[in-house]
Amino acid sequence: MLLILDAVGGLDYAATNQFSYDNPIRVTSNSWGSSGPFDPMNPVNIATYELYKRGIVSVFAAGNDGPGEDTHNPYAQAPWVVSVGASEKDSVLTSFSSRGKRGEMGTFTMPDGREWTYFNQPTIVANGVDIVSTRTLTGALPATAAEQDANGIAPAHLPFYSHMSGTSMATPHVAGIVALMLEANPHLNPAQVKDILERTATNLTGRLAWEAGAGHVNAYAALAEASGMRNDFGGTVNTLREFNSNALLSPGGDPVPFSILFTPVGEVEDVTFEVGPEVAWVAARATVDNTIAVVLTDPDGVQYGSAISLPAIGSTVVAGGPGKAGTWKVTVRGIGSVSGVALDPLGATNGYAAPGYVDGQVTFLNSGGYTGLDDIGGHAAEKAIEHAVAYRLVDGYSDRKFRPDQHIRRRELAQYLLMGSTIRQQLPLDGTPSFTDLDVDSPYYAYAESAVAGGAPLRDLAQDDAGVMGLYNGQFRPNDPVTRASLAYSLVQALGMQDQAVAFSGDLTVFHDGQRIPLDDAGQIPAALRGYVQLALDMGLLNARFSLTQGPFDLSPTLHARFDPTERVTRGGWSVAAGRFMTQYQVAQD
C-alpha cells in the first residue's frame, strides 16, 4: 500500500505542479510497474487518467518479464498511456521485454462516462540494452557492468554513470521524443501523441502486435508528423492495416538438443529427429567459437544451411526451413574458403574449423491453420508461405488466392520488405516524390519511397547506406519482376551489410558439405552485386542450384553449382527467402 501511495503521490505531484514551472509539465516517464491483470479502477490508472485529461502524456515501461506471453505491466495497459518495450541496438526485440497477450482486449467505462477499449500489448519499442544512465554512489555494480563501464565511460564519470538494460532504459527515450514532439507542437493532446508514435513506427521483423506493439519508435518521422511537415505517415505499419491472409503458428514440441563432434577429416556424425505433419517450420541453432555452419537436411534430401560463424557475421548460427513430415538430420561443417580463397582446394576435409563439439538445439513451430490462402495446399512452398504469412512477411490477395508461382513485382517486394525487414518508413519532407511512375495515391507509394530511401534499415546504425531497392534512371518501375540477383541485394542491404558486400573480392562460391563450390554462372552476376550474392549464399538467405556431370571416362562425377541471377523470383520463392531472412535477423537477439 505504501508503494502504491508513493507512486500515486508522484503522479499527483505532476498534476498539482503542472504550471509551477516556466514550461508546463506535459510528459512523465515511469520506469516502474507491477504484475497482474489490468484494472481501470486501480489508483495508479485513475491517476494517469487524470493526467491524461490535463494534457500530460504518461509513458510507462512495459516490464522486464519476457519473453513469455501475458507479462505486460498492468499500468502500461491503460489505453491513455504509452507502453514501451525494449529493443537491442541491432534492432531486435530483446528477450526480457514483457509481452502482452495475443487477442486480449476489453471495453470499460470510466467514472466520467467515457468508454474506452484496451489492448494487452505494448505501444512502441525503443532501445533498452546497454544504455548509459545515472547510478547511485553507493550501489555495487555487477562485474560485467563494471568492466563495460571502464571500457566505455570516461573515468571522471564512472562514479555517476553506468551501463544498464531494461524497459526502464527504453522508456526515457520515448518520453524524450514526446517532449520534442510537444515542443514542436504544444497543441498536441496525449491521444494525438500516441497516434503519431504508432503511425510513424517501424515494423520489427517477425514480431506481432502483442509482442512489440506498432514496432520500433521513429523519432525523425514522429517529429516530422508532429510539426506538420507531413501528415500521412502510417501507410506501412502492420498493426494499422487489414491483411488478406492470416495464419497461426504456435511453439511445437520440446526442442531436440544435439551435441555433434566436428572433425576436419573423416565422417562427421549427424543427429536424426522426427518431424510430424503439423510442423510448419524447423530451425537449428548453435552458438560456437569456431568457423562452423549448421546444416539441416529434410526427408527428401533438401539441405538448409546456416551462415558460417565468422566475425563479420556472428557466433550464433541458425539454419531454418519449411516443415516436412519424416526423418530429418542435423550436422555441422567447417568453412571451405575465406573471401573467395580456397582453404581446402583438393576437397579432402570437412572444411576448415578446429575439432570439437558443437552444442545446440532444434526447435519447431506448429501450424494452427490459415485463411485467405486457398491455392497453396500441396504446393512445395506451402509451409514456408504459412510461416511467412503468420509473421507478416508476405500477404495474399483479396480473392483469397496467394498465387505462389506468380512472379513477385517490385511494388510487392517494397511492401514486403517494409512489412518484415525492419525498414523505417520515410517520406520526402518537401512533398516531392522520389520518382514519377508510381502515383502518390497508390497503396504501394509509401512502401516504395521507404525502400529507396538511404539509411532506412535500422541495422544501418550510421544511416548512410543506400536504399534496399534502387531506381532505374530515376524511375521505380513498380511492375517489373524481381530477379534473384536483385533480391540478394535487397536482403543483404536490409541487414545493414553494405560495407561487407562492397568489400568482397574473390571468386563466387557456395558452401556445400564443407567445401566451396565455384558458381558456374558467376560471370552473369554484375560486378556491383557479386558481394551481395556471396553474402546471401553464406548466410543461407538464398540457395544455389546443384548438378552433377560425368564424362565418359571420368571415375566420378563433378559437382557443379549455379546461382541463376537473372531468374525471376516467385511469390512462393520470396516466402522461403523471407523466412530464412527472419531466422537470420533474429539470431542477433541476446
Question: Can you say where each PLM-predicted feature lies in the sequence?
Answer:
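Subtilisin-like serine protease catalytic core
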Residues: 1-5, 21-26, 52-55, 77-81, ...
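Subtilisin-like peptidase catalytic core
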Residues: 1-40, 85
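Active-site alpha-helical elements of protease catalytic centers
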Residues: 1-8, 162-182
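C-terminal subdomain of the subtilisin-like protease fold in secreted/lumenal serine endopeptidases
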Residues: 25-29, 157-161, 183-269
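Extracellular S/T/G-rich loop segment that most often corresponds to the catalytic His/Ser-adjacent loop
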Residues: 76-175
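Acidic, Ser/Thr/Pro-rich low-complexity intrinsically disordered segments
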Residues: 211-212, 224, 261-305
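C-terminal edge strands of extracellular/lumenal beta-sandwich accessory domains
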Residues: 233, 240, 296-303, 320-374
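N-terminal propeptides
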Residues: 236, 361-590
